[in-house]
From Swiss-Prot:
GO terms for cellular component: cytoplasm. It is found in: Cytoplasm. It comes from Synechococcus sp. (strain CC9902). Specifically methylates position 2 of adenine 2503 in 23S rRNA and position 2 of adenine 37 in tRNAs. Belongs to the radical SAM superfamily. RlmN family. Binds 1 [4Fe-4S] cluster. The cluster is coordinated with 3 cysteines and an exchangeable S-adenosyl-L-methionine. The active site is at 92 (proton acceptor), 337 (s-methylcysteine intermediate). Its main location: cytoplasm. It catalyses: adenosine(2503) in 23S rRNA + 2 reduced [2Fe-2S]-[ferredoxin] + 2 S-adenosyl-L-methionine = 2-methyladenosine(2503) in 23S rRNA + 5'-deoxyadenosine + L-methionine + 2 oxidized [2Fe-2S]-[ferredoxin] + S-adenosyl-L-homocysteine; adenosine(37) in tRNA + 2 reduced [2Fe-2S]-[ferredoxin] + 2 S-adenosyl-L-methionine = 2-methyladenosine(37) in tRNA + 5'-deoxyadenosine + L-methionine + 2 oxidized [2Fe-2S]-[ferredoxin] + S-adenosyl-L-homocysteine. Its cofactor is [4Fe-4S] cluster. Reaction proceeds by a ping-pong mechanism involving intermediate methylation of a conserved cysteine residue. One of its GO terms (biological process) is rRNA base methylation. This is Probable dual-specificity RNA methyltransferase RlmN. [4Fe-4S] cluster binds at residues 112, 116, 119.
Length: 351
């Protein structure tokens, strides 16, 4: 959006200031106020001449910040924000704190077209993709809400990032160069869109110089048949083709791929499933991240027992697969993996 300043680099803001008839240092001042001070309107940038601020607002230039609609905090301090865009759409983003880090789980679209059966986001379909400033804002909003500098960012909120790759990669550039978050601390999660992984690698090298962020591919099943049952769009992307594209991505970037696997009680969590998964990803420079299912209202999937989770993990480890188990955070506020939607909690009811 040409009149929005958030999301622009220091160099872009310097050039823009010169084009407006001012010195380039004014662009650097704006950059500081956008990313370090987190202003929400041009009128707040007191370092700029008042007359110029008035002129810019008259020309409809704006910062591009979103509006905080609702904030909820879980018992474990995980914080979920409902944010409104200028056109009235809403998205959710989550801040996940530990003693050592603050991870922000951000959305790349309003809703999601992938319709994974175990995920709340896809139940309402896709409204539109988010612009760069709308994605960047989520990190700033969490920073403000939690009064803490984010250390890690994961594109695991609402939407399919590879259906909005231009804005996602520009956001990564902004997070890296403007907010100082290292690429290796950024993860892009995808359920898989045919032919996009090699394109992502090439576009990342063009825009970022190197693709150093982590790619996380959501498998959630050890074979094509079961994957299609859980992920309707998987019918267009055969399992072997997806893994071949992951290998191609690895060859292009030199970066290990992470595979995500949601464990659904007595559906995809048998030891036989673990053995089949190990056969698929074994000998591959990769890592498997296990995620216990987080309940949503519309589905009757079960969260697996801790015994079944541990048995699944042991099978992978015995077969030489690097594996970890993601802790579920924010469950009591519907802020955990797979639970995000465009709503907030009022008492015990979704509104």
């Amino acid at each position: 959006m040409k009149n929005v300043l958030l999301g622009r680099s220091a160099a872009e803001l310097e050039d823009w200031a010169v084009a407006q008839g001012h010195k380039s240092f004014r662009g650097r001042q704006i950059h500081d106020w956008l990313y370090n001070k987190g202003v929400k309107s041009l009128s707040e940038i007191s370092a700029l001449p008042k007359q110029w601020r008035t002129e810019l607002e008259a020309q409809t230039f704006r910062v591009g910040r979103l509006k905080l609609v609702h904030q909820s905090v879980a018992a474990d301090a995980t914080t979920k924000l409902l944010l409104a865009t200028d056109d009235g759409e809403t998205i959710e983003t989550v801040g996940i704190p530990t003693d050592q880090r603050l991870t922000v789980c951000i959305s790349s679209q309003v809703g999601c077209p992938m319709a994974c059966r175990f995920c709340a986001t896809g139940k309402s379909g896709l409204q539109r993709s988010l612009a760069t400033h709308e994605i960047v804002d989520q990190v700033l909003s969490v920073r403000e809400a939690m009064d803490r500098r984010p250390s890690h960012v994961v594109f695991m909120g609402m939407g399919e990032p590879l259906l909005n790759s231009e804005a996602v990669l520009e956001t990564i550039r902004c997070l890296n160069t403007d907010l100082g978050i290292g690429q290796r601390r950024i993860t892009v999660s995808t359920v898989g869109v045919p032919k996009t992984l090699p394109q992502l690698a090439e576009l990342a090298m063009e825009k970022l110089g190197r693709a150093q962020f982590t790619l996380a591919v959501s498998l959630h099943a050890p074979n094509q048949q079961l994957r299609e049952e859980l992920i309707p769009t998987a019918h267009a992307y055969p399992y072997d083709d997806l893994l071949d594209d992951c290998r191609h991505y690895l060859d292009l970037t030199g970066r290990r791929v992470s595979f995500e696997y949601i464990l659904l009680g007595e559906l995809n969590d048998h030891p036989e499933h673990a053995a089949e998964l190990a056969d698929r990803v074994g000998g591959f420079q990769s890592h498997v991240n296990l995620i216990a299912y987080n309940p949503i209202e519309e589905e009757e999937f079960k969260r697996p027992t801790s015994q079944r989770i541990e048995a699944f993990r042991r099978v992978l480890e015995r077969r030489g697969v690097a594996v970890s188990l993601r802790a579920s955070r924010g469950l009591d506020q519907n802020a955990a993996c797979g639970q995000l939607r465009r709503q907030h909690l009022t008492g015990s009811d979704l509104t």
